[in-house]
């Protein structure tokens, strides 16, 4: 019933599993953001799956719901509460894996809000060079008050889709101390 109230809005469902996608599609939402952490330890803590299990489930989702517009949201691109800051090549290589599966939209998530503008620029530049046909989005948490400048750095690199939340809501249960997303109103 809610979807009919907002016919000119693009709603999407953020989900880490097949059941979430199934529920979204059954509710009339076909814009899906499927979450996989670049950090395997965070992926196991957050959604209780290995990388291989998450990728296999992504393939099952793609096969079962061809009408779904899937964006893979890569969590912990800029840092992980368990593994620290990854070398830039690690998220680039993971993005290549989902791109090779047929995904053409990837969201780069600063899950715990520790990125800085230099890291954002370097990561996006590397992603754009490695996957020139891919649409990239950005998802920044504002833990250290860097959300706006990191978002600006992403926009300056050519990112045109920014995920944000009203009032900076959000967070991650497996990222103690991490705040919500950059506030839309900012």
Where are these regions (language model features)?
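Short gly/pro/ser/thr-enriched loop/turn and capping motifs at secondary-structure boundaries
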Residues: 39-42, 168-173
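Short acidic/histidine-rich active-site segments
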Residues: 162-167
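Short glycine/serine/threonine-rich phosphate/pyrophosphate-binding segments
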Residues: 145-151, 172-173
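Short pre-catalytic strand/loop immediately N-terminal to key active-site residues, enriched for Gly-Thr
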Residues: 136-140, 172-175
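N-terminal active-site wall of soluble small-molecule enzyme domains
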Residues: 1-23, 126
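Core AdoMet radical
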Residues: 9-16, 44-52
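C-terminal helical cap(s) of enzyme catalytic domains, especially alpha/beta-barrels
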Residues: 172-186
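Alpha/beta enzyme core
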Residues: 18-44, 56-64, 68-69, 77-138, ...
